[in-house]
Amino acid sequence: MITIIDYGLGNLGSIKNMLVRSGIKCTVSGDPDVIRGASRLILPGVGHFKFAMDTLHERGLVTVIQQRVREANIPLLGICLGGQLIGRHSEEGDVAGLGLVPMDVVAFDRARLTQCEKVPHMGWTVTPHADIPLFASVQQPARYYYVHSFHFRCDDPAAEIAWAEHGYRFASGVRHGNVIGVQFHPEKSHVYGQQLLRNFAAMEFGA
């Protein structure tokens, strides 16, 4: 059973509906006990990084998520802001994240953008690396919906599983062990998002 973590931010209904349409059993909960019993987790998110982390702390979810991922090796998929929260730190609010992936979240460097390249970045393009299970059987060219002003910056290039370009190349998907983060919204990306979520539900992560 996949548990979508409810902390008051994110497209919970859209994600749940996409999972249900894909034949995947899921539940939505912000109850720490339910999260402890989940076999897989999805961390959604839309909004401000600092507010999101403050909310997770207030609801007693930070330690629960960290323990399930680090100690029980439960797979987690972070989506959009949720994908950013799995990192160590964000320039948005200058605050620490969950620290599950060795990466930081940085603002787009406007000095490297042309007048036509606006912030927030809105688009549909993503280029997966070869042989990435999360993108198995996804029709190419893949189209995933973005709207964001900050992006991932990975320490280890091997953690990057997909990339996009907006003035310059940036990581749009990352994986570190049993933790995956995507900057885009699979729940808003039609058949491409459906296949990605099916893949996450079926992937073998190992111990």
Language-model regions: role of each:
Residues 141, 175-180:
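Beta-strand-turn-beta hairpins that frame and shape the catalytic cleft
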Residues 38:
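An anion/phosphate-binding loop that grips the pyrophosphate of nucleotide cofactors and donors
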Residues 88-166:
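Pocket-forming structural segment of enzyme catalytic cores
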